[in-house]
């Protein structure tokens, strides 16, 4: 389903999310690649099949193959890392923090896309997944590389809007809810 068609199916009570989606993808703080890569990574992380397929379909018009690969890779590796590092952060046992991760994360260095864009996508997914350690880490890297706080927040607007839309689409797809 086309993204516009999917957004038009959003119920009236979630109209703000529908309208926000149109706006957050056109924020001037982000390049087109940054915005659509963020949308792809977050739509994958949101785990709603309709939203994921609609965003991927539209994003293919705005991203080259390498950027699309990198956005998918960001969602993939953050899906793993956010759980691992959030556990280490939340656990009161200090031994876990000293133990090695022993998880492959080579795609972080070998995604083939713009490193700042990839970092931004990782940040957005980390925010969705609630990993404070990862959010701080990615935000610090972005700020050190000169990315503005406005651009960081623009990516988070995309993440929050996609997260909200996924929740509504899940509810509307389940007649029991």
From Swiss-Prot:
Which cysteines pair up through disulfides? They are 131-134
Molecular function GO terms recorded: alkyl hydroperoxide reductase activity; disulfide oxidoreductase activity; hydroperoxide reductase activity; peroxiredoxin activity
Q: Which reaction does it catalyse?
A: N(6)-[(R)-dihydrolipoyl]-L-lysyl-[lipoyl-carrier protein] + a hydroperoxide = N(6)-[(R)-lipoyl]-L-lysyl-[lipoyl-carrier protein] + an alcohol + H2O
Carries keyword Cell membrane? no
Query: Could you tell me which InterPro entries the record lists for this protein?
Result: AhpD, AhpD-like, AhpD_core, CMD-like
Cite a single GO BP annotation.
Answer: response to oxidative stress
Entry-linked SUPFAM superfamilies: AhpD-like
EC number(s) of the enzyme? 1.11.1.28
Active site, renumbered: 131, 134
Keyword Isomerase assigned to the entry: answer is no
Tell me which UniProt keywords the record has, alphabetically.
Antioxidant, Disulfide bond, Oxidoreductase, Peroxidase, Redox-active center
Functional summary from the UniProt entry? Antioxidant protein with alkyl hydroperoxidase activity. Required for the reduction of the AhpC active site cysteine residues and for the regeneration of the AhpC enzyme activity.
**Into which family does the record put it?**
Belongs to the AhpD family.
Identify the HAMAP family for this entry: AhpD
Q: What is this protein called?
A: Alkyl hydroperoxide reductase AhpD
Cite the source lineage. Bacteria, Pseudomonadati, Acidobacteriota, Terriglobia, Bryobacterales
Gene name per UniProt: ahpD
């Amino acid at each position: 389903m086309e993204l516009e068609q999917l957004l038009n199916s959003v119920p009236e009570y979630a109209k703000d999310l529908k309208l926000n989606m149109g706006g957050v993808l056109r924020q001037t703080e982000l390049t087109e690649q940054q915005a659509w890569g963020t949308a792809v990574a977050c739509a994958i992380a949101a785990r709603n099949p309709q939203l994921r397929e609609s965003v991927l379909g539209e994003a293919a018009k705005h991203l080259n193959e390498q950027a699309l690969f990198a956005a998918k890779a960001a969602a993939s590796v953050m899906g793993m890392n956010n759980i691992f590092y959030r556990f280490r952060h939340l656990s009161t046992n200090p031994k876990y923090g000293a133990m090695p991760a022993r998880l492959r994360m080579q795609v972080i260095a070998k995604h083939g896309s713009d490193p700042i864009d990839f970092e931004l996508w990782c940040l957005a997914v980390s925010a969705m997944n609630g990993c404070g350690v990862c959010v701080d880490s990615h935000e610090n890297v972005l700020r050190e590389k000169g990315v503005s706080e406005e651009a960081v927040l623009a990516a988070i607007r995309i993440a929050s809007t996609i997260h909200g839309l996924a929740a509504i689409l899940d509810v509307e797809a389940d007649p029991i809810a």
